[in-house]
């Protein structure tokens, strides 16, 4: 019961639409193409350094162990079949526990939790990567991106957001600045880089909060 409540707190606003903007175009959140955020691994097909945070498959946002000031815009929990990489089957996805249970009842694979998290990353001090940070909001430039997290990455990002939402229910997640960082993890003979979100004491600027509310259609 507690898990369900936490999920609703974090993701309740992700499906609402945007009102008509000054361009006169009726826009819905689903109509917006948000670039992907990835953490480069040894097997990644990218020239970026291993462990770096990559935006839109092109821009290196930060090297490993270097926090990026970030606002969490939205987060949505889901479930998918835990199919090994060597298999050719495409995992089926569910966005509710009932849908996940229905898939699990007929699947040979276990269902595993994952999340889609939309982040507003602030341009670091001294960064000249202006092409990546094309959203001027208040006194800073930002990049709006989305990251898909599962397993260890799910625990170090979405679960921390959900815990904050449950324990600080009167404080919107987007009102706080979070440190977004790529960290090296090891298990046995395997080593990889894992995304992590940690809340800070810094409050988000009023302009940023207004942007997020407008984006979510609040």
Tell where the protein language model's regions lie, with residue ranges.
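OB-fold ssDNA-binding interfaces and closely related basic DNA-contact patches used
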Residues: 1-137, 187-194, 198-204
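Short linear motifs at secondary-structure transitions and domain/linker junctions
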Residues: 85-97, 152-157, 169-175
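Generic beta-strand structural signal
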Residues: 113-118, 131, 140-145, 171-178
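Residues in well-ordered beta-strands of folded domains
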Residues: 118-120, 145-150, 181, 198
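Short acidic, glycine/tyrosine-flanked loop/strand segments centered on an H-E-D-like triad
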Residues: 123-164
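Long, compositionally biased interface segments
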Residues: 162-218
């Amino acid at each position: 019961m507690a898990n369900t409540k936490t999920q609703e707190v974090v993701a309740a606003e992700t499906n609402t639409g945007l009102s008509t903007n000054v361009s006169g175009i009726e826009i819905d959140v689903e109509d917006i193409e948000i670039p992907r955020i990835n953490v480069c691994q040894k097997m990644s097909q990218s020239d970026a350094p291993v462990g770096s945070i990559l935006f839109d498959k092109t821009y290196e946002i930060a090297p490993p162990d270097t926090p990026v000031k970030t606002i969490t815009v939205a987060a949505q929990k889901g479930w998918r079949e835990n199919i090994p990489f060597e298999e050719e089957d495409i995992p089926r996805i569910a966005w509710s526990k009932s849908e996940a249970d229905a898939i699990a009842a007929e699947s040979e694979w276990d269902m595993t939790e994952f999340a889609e998290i939309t982040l507003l990353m602030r341009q670091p001090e001294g960064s000249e990567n202006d092409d990546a940070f094309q959203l001027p909001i208040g006194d800073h430039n930002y990049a709006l991106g989305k990251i898909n997290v599962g397993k260890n990455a799910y625990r170090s990002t979405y679960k921390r957001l959900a815990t904050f939402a449950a324990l600080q229910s009167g404080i919107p997640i987007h009102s706080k600045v979070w440190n977004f960082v790529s960290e090296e993890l090891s298990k046995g003979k395997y080593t990889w880089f894992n995304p992590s979100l940690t809340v800070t004491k810094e409050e988000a600027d009023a302009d940023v909060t207004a942007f997020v509310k407008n984006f979510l259609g609040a």
